[in-house]
């Protein structure tokens, strides 16, 4: 019997009571890992669904806990599916654990989904953003900063050239806005001081972009894909630091985003590898109150956080993801 290991261990995005009530028979086994009905993180729910579908197809399915699993643990598996991924490993153990995590996935004899190579490619945002630019996709003007060696004067030239009065700085390996900062009227001192802080916090690379005033007014359009097909899309805005979620009202814009998303997935499949799942986020800047002037790809996630609220299709992605993963390893 072949073994599938599912990398889990977050404490994020617990499933709703409604989801638990409907699927309690598939989730009750999680109590052996001290995960109870009052708080089941999304990745444990995904693990449960992969376990259900995998066992139906003759696989043994085991958890691999992202903050502690070793190469020995990984090598007990024939296949590994990452839900808890590199950014989480950095969050729990800094650069040391992130490096260990990536080395385990690189060295294991198991076949890893998504591969270590593509995980690293997406985590290192400067790599995939350069890829998007090369392929002709719209991205916002971005300055990439290596915290081991950078020139503040070059950064200021980029700011002056693009006439930026407000900028945002976001580190690679940052998640849930960790390390994200908006800087008004940027100066060499403000930038240098913040980059020093990020380096001291363990980050290695940073993206600097324009702060787009209209960004939050119309929000991001987040599109979730599995098996090359779009399952759902929703709009996210921010109010007092909290996410506000709603349906996308501009259907034409949504169709355009989906068309670009499908093309991007085809390109990634051709140039890198076929993805079991992916979330592609689009953002707009506006020139009026009715229609987006120009939209761009703001972010790609290949191990996205998936909830069970209405705007994320009530957790249907868990079943779709599990079926597509098992289908892929059986093919």
What are these regions (language model features)?
Residues 1-7:
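Extreme N-terminal starter segment of soluble prokaryotic enzymes
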Residues 272-275, 284-331:
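C-terminal active-site "lid" helix and adjoining low-complexity regulatory extension at the edge
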Residues 178, 182-271, 286, 295-296:
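Phosphate-binding site of ATP-dependent enzymes
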Residues 63-66, 208-210, 272-288:
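A short glycine-rich, hydrophobically flanked beta-strand micro-motif that places a catalytic Asp/Glu
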Residues 5, 79-83, 168, 207:
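Structural motif
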Residues 132-133, 159-178, 203-216, 234, ...:
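ATP-grasp fold ATP-binding core
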Residues 12-13, 37-150:
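Conserved N-proximal alpha/beta basic substrate-recognition cap immediately N-terminal to
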Residues 15-41:
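A solvent-exposed, charged loop/short amphipathic helix patch at secondary-structure junctions
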């Amino acid at each position: 019997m072949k073994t599938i290991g599912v990398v889990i261990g977050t404490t994020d995005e617990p499933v709703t009571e409604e989801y638990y009530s409907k699927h309690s028979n598939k989730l009750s086994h999680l109590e052996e890992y001290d995960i109870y009905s009052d708080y089941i993180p999304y990745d444990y729910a995904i693990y449960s669904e992969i376990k259900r579908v995998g066992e139906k197809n003759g696989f043994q399915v085991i958890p691999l806990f992202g903050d502690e699993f070793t190469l020995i643990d990984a090598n007990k598996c024939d296949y590994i599916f990452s839900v808890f991924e590199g950014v989480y490993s950095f969050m729990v153990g800094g650069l040391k654990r992130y490096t260990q995590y990536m080395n385990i996935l690189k060295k294991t004899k198991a076949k890893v989904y998504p591969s270590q190579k593509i995980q690293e490619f997406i985590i290192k945002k400067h790599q995939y953003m350069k890829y998007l630019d090369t392929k002709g996709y719209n991205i916002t003007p971005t300055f990439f900063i290596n915290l081991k060696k950078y020139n503040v004067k070059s950064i200021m030239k980029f700011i002056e050239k693009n006439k930026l009065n407000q900028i945002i700085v976001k580190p690679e390996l940052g998640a849930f806005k960790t390390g994200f900062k908006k800087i008004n009227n940027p100066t060499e001192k403000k930038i240098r001081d913040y980059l020093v802080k990020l380096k001291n916090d363990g980050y290695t690379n940073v993206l600097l972009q324009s702060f787009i005033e209209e960004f939050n007014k119309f929000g991001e359009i987040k599109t979730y894909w599995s098996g090359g097909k779009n399952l759902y899309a929703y709009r996210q805005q921010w109010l007092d630091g909290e996410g506000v979620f709603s349906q996308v009202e501009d259907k034409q814009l949504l169709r355009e985003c989906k068309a670009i998303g499908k093309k991007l997935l085809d390109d990634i499949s051709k140039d890198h590898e076929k993805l079991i799942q992916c979330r592609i986020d689009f953002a707009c800047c506006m020139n009026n109150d009715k229609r987006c002037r120009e939209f761009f790809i703001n972010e790609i996630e290949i191990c996205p956080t998936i909830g069970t609220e209405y705007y994320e299709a009530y957790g249907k992605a868990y079943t779709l993801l599990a079926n597509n993963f098992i289908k892929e390893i059986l093919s």
